[in-house]
Amino acid sequence: MKPSIILYKTLPDDLLHRLEAHFTVTQVPNLHPETVARHAQAFASAQGLLGASETVNRALLEKMPALRAASTISVGYDNVEVDALTARKIVLMHTPAVLTETVADTVMALMLTTARRVVDVAERVKAGEWTESIGPAWFGIDVHHKTLGIVGMGRIGMALAQRAHFGFTMPVLYHARRRHQEAEDRFNARYCDLDTLLQEADFVCVILPLTAETRHLFGATQFARMKSSAIFINAGRGPVVDENALIAALQNGEIYAAGLDVFEQEPLSVDSPLLNMSNVVAVPHIGSATHETRYNMMACAVDNLIDALQGKIEKNCVNPQAAG
């Protein structure tokens, strides 16, 4: 008899068939309490859980006594109570490698779009404001040869450093929990403390997960240390930044502009002051959002769950200690 799983994300037919070859699959639209109650027997017997974005917490786990593995279609997992899973000896699988290059492309795009004011001037053209040769009021700033500061030198940070160093001749500074010798050797990246990075970088790019230590790591003090000509990019997690402090820094001219893929509350409120600022490029958490990469993430998550329920957790496991 096949193990049973709960699937709370729509998958392409070929990936769904791959799951069904190994498991009895119950598809649900979400993990809301009413959904769990409606499918109580399926949740109670499920050994696997696969999907994205929904909260996986102790209350849900209480309804899933047979659960052995959860697989998220993402690299981040701040919506999952990992400690609760580990205490139950439930492994959590994620998809860290398949989205690296695509997210780095997104960060680079935010840097270019923000510095060259692409969105702002494109909207002005559409509004009929381009009636003569443009002057300084339409100008942006250069990206090439400017100093890039990367906060979080993981896979994505490395891919961004590669683009900046080889493609744009940018000196690279970085701050991370530990020094990254490969970054220093390949890209001549310079490790420094956060204050130094903020003071010297022309672009401050944040690529951090959300943890107790990183929540509101960037606030009024940090923005005050940045150059008034600096551009701030956040492509990690929204709550790493105190959004009110960022808004104030932009309004007061403490920094030049911001390119934001993530926000404290998502979707971003239509009343957010960020949406009325011409020096802000705000996009809806599109970091990995290409057809190719999202498919690859789903395929990776499917394979992760198949492997995990066969006891294979050598790669992509967040909490391997749970298997002990």
From Swiss-Prot:
Where does the UniProt entry say this protein principally localizes?
cytoplasm
Q: What does this protein do?
A: Catalyzes the NADPH-dependent reduction of glyoxylate and hydroxypyruvate into glycolate and glycerate, respectively.
* Family the entry assigns: Belongs to the D-isomer specific 2-hydroxyacid dehydrogenase family. GhrB subfamily.
Q: Which HAMAP family match?
A: 2_Hacid_dh_C_GhrB
Q: Give GO MF terms, alphabetically.
A: glyoxylate reductase (NADPH) activity; hydroxypyruvate reductase (NADH) activity; hydroxypyruvate reductase (NADPH) activity; NAD binding
Catalytically driven reaction(s): glycolate + NADP(+) = glyoxylate + NADPH + H(+); (R)-glycerate + NAD(+) = 3-hydroxypyruvate + NADH + H(+); (R)-glycerate + NADP(+) = 3-hydroxypyruvate + NADPH + H(+)
Out of the domains of life, which is the source?
Bacteria
**What name is this protein filed under?**
Glyoxylate/hydroxypyruvate reductase B
Entries under InterPro entries matching the protein: D-isomer_2-hydroxyacid_DH (IPR050223), D-isomer_2_OHA_DH_cat_dom (IPR006139), D-isomer_DH_CS (IPR029753), D-isomer_DH_NAD-bd (IPR006140), Glyo/OHPyrv_Rdtase_B (IPR023756), NAD(P)-bd_dom_sf (IPR036291)
Which residues does UniProt mark as catalytic? 237, 266, 285 (proton donor)
Enumerate the subcellular locations listed in this protein's record, separating them with semicolons.
Cytoplasm
Question: Which key words tag this protein in UniProt?
Answer: Cytoplasm, NAD, NADP, Oxidoreductase
Would you tell me the Gene Ontology cellular component terms?
cytosol; plasma membrane
Per its UniProt entry, what is the enzyme's top EC class, as one word? oxidoreductase
Q: Which SUPFAM superfamilies match?
A: Formate/glycerate dehydrogenase catalytic domain-like, NAD(P)-binding Rossmann-fold domains
- Alphabetical list of PROSITE patterns matching this protein: D_2_HYDROXYACID_DH_2, D_2_HYDROXYACID_DH_3
Q: What is its EC number?
A: 1.1.1.79, 1.1.1.81
Q: Relate the assembly described in the record.
A: Homodimer.
